[in-house]
Amino acid sequence: MSRITTSLDHYEVWFLTGSQNLYGEETLQQVAEQSQEIARQLEEASDIPVRVVWKPVLKDSDSIRRMALEANASDRTIGLIAWMHTFSPAKMWIQGLDALQKPFLHLHTQANVALPWSSIDMDFMNLNQAAHGDREFGYIQSRLGVVRKTVVGHVSTESVRDSIGTWMRAAAGWAAVHELKVARFGDNMRNVAVTEGDKTEAELKFGVSVNTWGVNDLVERVDAATDAEIDALVDEYERLYDIAPELQRGGERHESLRYGAAIEVGLRSFLEEGGFGAFTTSFEDLGGLRQLPGLAVQRLMAEGYGFGAEGDWKTAVLIRAAKVMGSGLPGGASLMEDYTYHLVPGEEKILGAHMLEICPTLTTGRPSLEIHPLGIGGREDPVRLVFDTDPGPAVVVAMSDMRERFRIVANVVEVVPLDEPLPNLPVARAVWKPAPDLATSAAAWLTAGAAHHTVMSTQVGVEVFEDFAEIARTELLVIDEDTTLKGFTKEVRWNQAYHRLAQGL
């Protein structure tokens, strides 16, 4: 059995330095020392989330090829950073780059920040040649079609480290998705289009394994939950949440809370034993379950599991990726759904929620644990956590299957405080203003065919999803403060042509 984690501690990124034997041993020793110093600065920086491992200077084609193959074979290695300290003839890199299957970042930097004007001689010029050595390297990457992120500047600069750290988080998300198994309990909500998708293509494209289990396989685990396991969870609920009086010990509906805890015990047992990192449920396919899972889903998402409602495995994958990519950062990531609008001119905003399953990592407050009727599903009233999402910057991201490819759409948003309390709304919720404005955002979202289920992340911004999509060679459309509907519509049309051509090539 394996416990879920979002930690990046078991991952590493290799730091590669290119040169050639032409320079001689003394210069190559300087190259090694200075590249180790660059790697050390990255490794010790608090804003670099993944361990950086320096590798010996690469000087010939065979060593480069072997390094790429070693990286491919290492489960710990989630990507490579390369820098051409001197001039490294790029034909030496062809076999290695062609074989490489890991995310790649080209760091265009140099050892020194300022030029030592009064002492510069030809020895200095020969040693510090990244300004044109990296141009040679950039050419061969483009010639080979290598997908990479290019970062320019000295590693002592915060913006440079931020870009590298963001790419590392995207690479970690990519690694997590590649080892991800998704358990679907039942199938999609009947007749819904956007939650469907090609699971075989997803395994080829993203590495994720998506399969279905009968809901009653889960029911067996729920029914097997012991009183001791349930008691332990109820104790935890009492520590963490404000429990409604009727659900408290001795309350008239306390048994409903205990059954909610049994669902959590059973779900966690099933997921851990199967090595799953994400799951879906459907209110139309509940088998012997007495409640639609709500509280259990919320708490498992908070631990790092991906989740999709109504069989939506694509959103479950995105949420798991977002959880890993946001590891260690304040905020959270959750299933979200655009529900209804506030359309007062000048005040336009969106009220988002779901039936039950919003992750409590979106709040720093103390959620209330409540029970209310649910008009669909035909089961007992489910227990759930109720709270308001913390105000602040966020991004909402969706994935759609566009037949010949997957499309990711991201909207930059600002979560805002509620205008008034919502005493009669019995679910967790968020209110946000989308960029650039609601009308443009919604029209662009509809134009893109983006899904109604999203992941909302308050931990990471849109750049990490841009890097993730680039690594995955997957279409990404961004709606932000610079978006115009006219320009966005053109981009959608251009993308259709580009991605179809790219697949053919």
UniProtKB/Swiss-Prot annotation:
Upper classification of the organism: Bacteria, Bacillati, Actinomycetota, Actinomycetes, Micrococcales
Pathway: Carbohydrate degradation; L-arabinose degradation via L-ribulose; D-xylulose 5-phosphate from L-arabinose (bacterial route): step 1/3
Protein name: L-arabinose isomerase
GO biological process: L-arabinose catabolic process to xylulose 5-phosphate
GO cellular component, one term: cytosol
Keyword Hydrolase carried by entry: no
HAMAP family in the cross-refs: Arabinose_Isome
Uppermost EC category: isomerase
EC number per UniProt: 5.3.1.4
Any one Gene Ontology molecular-function term assigned to this protein's record: manganese ion binding
Cofactor note text: Binds 1 Mn(2+) ion per subunit.
Keyword vocabulary terms for this entry: Arabinose catabolism, Carbohydrate metabolism, Isomerase, Manganese, Metal-binding
Encoding gene per record: araA
